[in-house]
Amino acid sequence: SEEGRAKLDKAARLYGAPTVIIVCADHDKAWVRKYDQMQTTDIDASILTDHMMLEATEQGLGSLWVCWFDPKIVREEFELPDNLEPINLLALGYADTEEKGPDRHKTERISLDELVMYK
């Protein structure tokens, strides 16, 4: 809704995306590793977001994974209960620019030496 987008605009730059999904972790329902009590909420939210992006692409939509947002503002504006933690935002819509072709990687790709450390 317009009201929801106005609330999100207080927390992040979403550049007019028509649809934004707030991906949250539910700490009351999260799986916990028994050895060290680690919750896998960030991992689970990442997998979920990735799958939603793949499906959005399949449906002809553009998507943008947004981590640059203020979770405190999202929590307050949407009155999220304490057990829900906003992990990321997923903006969806039709792209307003042309897609770049795969040939761009020949000139724009970071070299392997800059990405990988050998020891």
Where on the chain are the PLM-derived regions?
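Short secondary-structure boundary segments
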Residues: 25, 68, 94
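Short, electropositive alpha-helical surface patch
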Residues: 74-87
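Short active-site-adjacent structural elements
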Residues: 31, 73-76, 97-101
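Structural motif
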Residues: 18-20, 63, 85-87
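Glycine/small-residue-rich phosphate/adenosyl-binding loop
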Residues: 1-45
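Small-aliphatic-rich amphipathic alpha-helix that forms the alpha element of a beta-alpha
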Residues: 21, 36-77
